[in-house]
Amino acid sequence: MMLWQATPASLWQGRDDSAEAPNALRLFQTIARAERFAPQEMPGDIALLGFACDEGVRRNKGRTGAGHGPEALRRALANMASHQGHDRCVDMGTISVDGEQLEAAHQALREAVAACQRAGKRTLVLGGGHETAFGHGAGVLDAFPGEKVGIINLDAHLDLRFAECASSGTPFRQLALECDAQQRGFHYTCIGVSRAANTQALWDEAARRQVAVVEDLAVLADFDTHVLPELERNIAQYDRLYLTIDLDVLPAREMPAVSAPAALGVPLAILLRIVEPLCRSGKLQAVDLVEFNPQFDIDGQGARAAARLAWQIAHWWR
């Protein structure tokens, strides 16, 4: 596997409470770790993958540093308690960008995701900038060519930019073009969008692509009226679901460690209300958490918030 590296055992360290009781375990004690990329040979049905890349953020004129996200998030996860579902996780290593070669990294991630999915594993990818979503989403599309895949993005931004080259602002336009090329529907829902952070051109493109959008104000005003029906529609209409969480959807007070912190945002407690029914639906095939930038974290606050999201997803995933 090109651009792939196994995760060092040193990243999975934590407090050992096993002297108290046999089940006093933490994630670092229950996660399996692949020494080579062979998902069909590994136990568990949740493949944890890193995408150490922020070349897309650089191209999008953002604050770089998210390439260090996978390592920081693994460290944050390692010491969390291991409960139901967590022993299904296997660390399948990290795809790392080589210099500015984003397109090659995209292809490597795409192939790694498709291989994991075909081996019967759902994928939980730790980014990396939001360019992660193109490689991840394309891998899911490749693994399920005859099925309807719904894409749900929790994000302050639509990420449908027109640009000469791929970036962290283009992944869903790229996925739309990929769906066009494969002659399949592009089914995209974006929840938590800030109207103040997206130009009219992006809203026009969303309308042209028939994107279902729920703005941040609507999420905060009435969850049951604006959000729940969209979740229920996605679960009912599509065969598989791909959930991508841009951590800049969170308020800056909860998530300072991103390229573009949100002035308003959707709080973590509400994000968990969105995530739970998707995890329990039996249709959620893939999840990623992107844009975490440890360079801008404050006392590990952002890492803990992101890790709690990932922890909860693995716990609820059915």
From Swiss-Prot:
Entry binding sites for Mn(2+) 1: 130, 155, 159, 246
Any GO BP annotation: L-histidine catabolic process to glutamate and formamide
Binding of Mn(2+) 2, residues: 155, 157, 246, 248
Cofactors demanded by this protein: Mn(2+)
Cofactor detail note: Binds 2 manganese ions per subunit.
Keyword Disulfide bond appears in the UniProt entry: no
One family name in Pfam for this protein: Arginase
Reaction catalyzed: N-formimidoyl-L-glutamate + H2O = formamide + L-glutamate
InterPro entries, per the entry: HutG, Ureohydrolase, Ureohydrolase_dom_sf, Ureohydrolase_Mn_BS
Role played: Catalyzes the conversion of N-formimidoyl-L-glutamate to L-glutamate and formamide.
PANTHER family for this protein: ARGINASE/AGMATINASE (PTHR11358), FORMIMIDOYLGLUTAMASE (PTHR11358:SF35)
Protein name in UniProt: Formimidoylglutamase
Phylogenetic placement of the source organism: Bacteria, Pseudomonadati, Pseudomonadota, Gammaproteobacteria, Enterobacterales
